[in-house]
């Protein structure tokens, strides 16, 4: 996954995203799917500046949360945010190279991060998530998805991506989240050209996860489906 853009935006990331109440609601919805006990471990894939981590550390007071991200600047901000917290750990990694031993985690979570995985590496990413989860460990993954598969110049896919991104951007304009609106509009050419942004269908990720050993897969629908957000929940099959 490319890191240059996220290294550049790291300092302003929270300022851009914090006014987006929809983004904050998705974080809460992910958290509602995580039910931990004492000593359990959660992995946050693509932790960024630590917004989902912060929510989980608050709502899962007996759990340990490990965040990984490919961007060094994001990691520095996240590590500073949780400095001195013995239940938080931050390191460099991505969906294809998590950097932990096998069967270490009870939960793996991710929010708007895995669409940065190169299309040809999606199967490897699904396998890596399965590797680090314990048997019966749970994945909770939220992202933006297209309804139409296809290449960079596929008209149906292009239209679907543009409609979703513009709808979400206009929603942020209505919220007064002006910088988030601009950020979303600036990403449209990258999504269209498949340049560091590789939004795909829910069904494609479900197929990769099933092949990697996940079962009890379900798609959790969230408000404003026109934005493309869905939450995928799955359980790693027992040994």
Task: Label the model's feature ranges.
Residues 96-107:
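A short acidic, Gly/Pro-enriched loop at the edge of an enzyme's catalytic core
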Residues 212-239:
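Core SAM-dependent methyltransferase catalytic element
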Residues 1-36, 51-55, 189:
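Conserved class I S-adenosyl-L-methionine
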Residues 43-45, 49-97:
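Class I SAM-dependent methyltransferase SAM/SAH-binding core
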Residues 123-135:
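A short glycine-rich, Lys/Arg-flanked "PGG" loop and its adjoining helix->strand segment in the class I
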Residues 41, 136-138:
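Short glycine-centered segments of the SAM/dcSAM-binding site in methyltransferase folds
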Residues 107-121:
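A short SAM/SAH-binding and catalytic strip from SAM-dependent methyltransferases
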Residues 142-210:
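C-terminal alpha-helical "lid/dimerization" subdomain adjacent to the S-adenosyl-L-methionine
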């Amino acid at each position: 996954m490319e890191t240059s853009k996220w290294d550049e935006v790291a300092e302003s990331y929270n300022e851009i995203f914090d006014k987006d109440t929809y983004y904050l609601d998705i974080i809460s919805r992910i958290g509602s799917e995580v039910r931990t006990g004492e000593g359990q471990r959660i992995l946050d894939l693509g932790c960024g500046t630590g917004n989902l981590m912060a929510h989980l550390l608050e709502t899962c007071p007996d759990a340990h949360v490990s965040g990984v991200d490919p961007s060094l600047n994001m990691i520095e901000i996240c590590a500073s945010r949780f400095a001195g917290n013995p239940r938080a750990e931050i390191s460099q990694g991505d969906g294809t190279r998590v950097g932990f031993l096998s069967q270490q985690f009870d939960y793996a979570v991710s929010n708007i991060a895995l669409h940065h995985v190169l299309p040809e590496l999606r199967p490897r990413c699904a396998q890596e998530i399965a590797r680090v989860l314990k048997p019966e460990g749970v994945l909770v993954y939220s992202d933006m998805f297209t309804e139409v598969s296809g290449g960079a110049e596929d008209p149906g896919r292009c239209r679907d991506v543009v409609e979703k991104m513009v709808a979400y951007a206009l929603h942020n304009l209505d919220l007064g989240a002006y910088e988030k609106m601009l950020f979303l509009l600036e990403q449209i050419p990258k999504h269209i050209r498949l340049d560091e942004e590789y939004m795909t269908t829910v069904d494609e990720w479900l197929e990769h996860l099933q092949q990697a050993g996940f079962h009890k897969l379900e798609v959790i629908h969230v408000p404003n489906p026109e934005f493309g957000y869905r939450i995928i929940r799955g359980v790693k099959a027992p040994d």
